[in-house]
Amino acid sequence: MQLLVITIDDCDEFLATLEGLRAHGMNGIVFQSTSLKHALLNSNVDAPPIFGRVSKIMSHDFESSHTAFLLLNDDQLEHAKRVIRRNTHGLGKKGVMFTLPVLSFEG
């Protein structure tokens, strides 16, 4: 059993990926998320001097990302990765996916 975590920046690609996973009987939980960089740009914490000027000129408007958690059997994992790669045209810098082993679960 594996926990597959995926974050995709492009909303349309994320939704297409979810539809593809759902079509193959895979379910999960979706959270709205944002990158650490964007979260810090919008924080009230004073940035270190080296980053202060950069953060002043960068736009604070950003589109949030979405993160999905899917609990998959080992035999579903590679298929799920193929669905993700297909819908994101290779993922690249558009997001990230990783897995964590799950030793037990209930529910």
Which residues make up each language-model segment?
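Positively charged, small/polar-rich N-terminal and surface patches that mediate targeting and assembly
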Residues: 1-107
